[in-house]
Amino acid sequence: MAITVYLSCLLVLSMAGLAQGIKSSLRSQDPGPQPLELKQAFTLFQIQYNRSYSNPEEYARRLDIFAHNLAQAQQLEEEDLGTAEFGVTPFSDLTEEEFGRLYGHRRMDGEAPKVGREVGSEEWGESVPPTCDWRKLDGVISSVKKQESCSCCWAMAAAGNIEALWAIKYRQSVELSVQELLDCGRCGDGCRGGFVWDAFITVLNNSGLASEKDYPFQGQVKPHRCLAKKRTKVAWIQDFIMLPDNEQKIAWYLATQGPITVTINMKLLKLYKKGVIEATPTSCDPFLVDHSVLLVGFGKSESVADRRAGAAGAQPQSRRSIPFWILKNSWGTKWGXGGYFRLYRGNNTCGITKYPLTARVDQPAKKRPVSCPP
């Protein structure tokens, strides 16, 4: 742990001033202003994230990608209206295409199935608390998972949703099998991608879900290897519902019922490190959603300097508080703030209101005994 923190500090120090120089050189098509410093930063990146390359040509290619990503990180930070910081992450040697292929949905976008329903107006409350963080209640939110090169964010988000709701309703912590959702799904496409409702349909079809311990994550799917019938179920769902695309209602449901899943545009997450992302529809298209995560809370930041102060009509040196959502990702704890990130709350940042989906958990229904009359 100490070595990792030390390397992170070295990376931050080495990035100071380097990104601006690289950004300027890319504009002028110059090979690079400070190649030695860039290579030193890249070496630190390789050590921290255990990267090695097969030949000098591949090394040179990844170094060039790293330089472009470093310049892009600075540009993203300059354009962001919140408090987000961007920089070197585990994905800094990947192109946009590689990143999207490995971590986003690969299936074509589709409509949610008719099984889910929107909650009726009679079920909505009016009062929403100022803050909510389900991580603070022991046993509700399981550890941050790492999907590796398997495009299974949809399955991990669904499993996390059921785990949290089960713990809240029955006061029983469970860690559920993502692998069962991948191996046994009839609608999802395993490690090639899927949607959260695919996972919920699988749980309904299989009459429950096994534990992670009993059916562990492999990060790959083999044909005809579904073991659902051979594994004991530890959690069940009654159905699943699609919430309205209204952030106030989503906040109320989250605070009163528990964590839900959302599917967002992950464009700005590749180089994200910490802070609140406040994007515009131009910088993060809310209609192009490609990554499912678990929404675990919301809050409001302390007063911070307004990055919008340079905009027309804004007061210089003004300060403001920023409302935000708290989201759990599936890229491991070395990404973001321990595997979590925050999005601005109130303007459908990155499409967070497009598919707010949640299961509703319940014990399996007991069949009434039937006997023939004498």
Curated annotation (Swiss-Prot):
SMART domains assigned: Inhibitor_I29, Pept_C1
UniProt subcellular location: Endoplasmic reticulum
InterPro entries named in the record: Papain-like_cys_pep_sf, Pept_asp_AS, Pept_his_AS, Peptidase_C1A, Peptidase_C1A_C, Peptidase_C1A_papain-like, Prot_inhib_I29
Catalytic residues as annotated in Swiss-Prot or TrEMBL: C153, H291, N329
EC top class, as a word: hydrolase
Domain of life: Eukaryota
Disulfide bond residue pairs: C150-C191, C184-C226
Glycan attachment residues as annotated in the record: N205, N347
GO CC annotations on file: endoplasmic reticulum; extracellular space; lysosome
GO biological process: proteolysis involved in protein catabolic process
Documented EC number(s): 3.4.22.-
Gene Ontology molecular function, alphabetical: cysteine-type endopeptidase activity
PANTHER family the UniProt entry points to: CYSTEINE PROTEASE FAMILY C1-RELATED (PTHR12411)
Function: May have a specific function in the mechanism or regulation of T-cell cytolytic activity.
Entry's family note: Belongs to the peptidase C1 family.
Protein name: Cathepsin W
The species this protein was found in: Felis catus
Lineage: Eukaryota, Metazoa, Chordata, Craniata, Vertebrata
